[in-house]
Amino acid sequence: MSAIFRNSDKERAAREAYLQLAAAADEFEQYANPHAVRIAAIADKIAEAFHLAPQDRKSLRTAARMHDLGEVAMERDYIQRAGSLTDEERIDLERHPVIGEQEAARASANRDVQLLVRWHHEWWNGDGYPDALRQNEIPLAARILRVADSYAALTDARPYRPAMTEEDARTQIIERAAIEFDPAVVNVLLSLHDLEELRSFAKPVDPLADTTTTDDGWNLFSLFMK
C-alpha cells in the first residue's frame, strides 16, 4: 500500500497546508471543541477493535482529519446557520464529500484517504451519498468514520444548538443502527467507555428551562448532523 502522502518536498508542503486547512474546518463549522481530532481518536479506537491493519488505521485517522475539507472549500453560510436546510441547500451540501475527495487528492493524500473522505456520508441502508453504497459495499473504515463523525458531532456544541449528553447521543446512534450505521460498528462504539474523546460537552440542564420540542427524532438528528 502506498504511503499516506506521496513523498516530495512540494507534496509534503501541500500536505501540511491541507492539514492546517482541515484544522480550520472546526473553526468554520463552529464546533466548540476540536472536532476532527476527536473523530480521529474515536475512529482509531473502533478500528483497533476490528483489528484493522496499521496502515489502514493511519489512513482512517488522516481521513478523519480531512473529512470536511469539502465544506470548507464550498464556504456556504448555511452550514453555520441555525435551523434546518432547504431542499436546495441540502442538495448543494451533498456535494461536499466529492469536493473533499478532490481536495484530499490536491493535498497528495493516497487513494485510500481520498475514498474515505468521499464515502464518509454513505449509509448502511443505501440512502447515503454521493454513491448510494450499501452495507459491505462501503469499506469498513468508511463505516467506522460515519459512526465516529456522528457521535462526535452529537456530543459537541455549535452556536445554534447545544451538545447532547453521552446517553442521548448513544440513544440516537442506536436508533439509527442498520439504517445509517453498520450495527457491528455501533456495537463496538457502545463498548467503549474509557476514551476521553467520548466525553460529551453538554452543559447541565437548567431545571426551570423549557425543554419541549416539536421536532420528531429524525428532524432533531438532522439538525445536529448538519
Task: Tell what function each PLM region has.
Residues 2-226:
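Histidine- and acidic-residue-rich, metal-dependent catalytic cores
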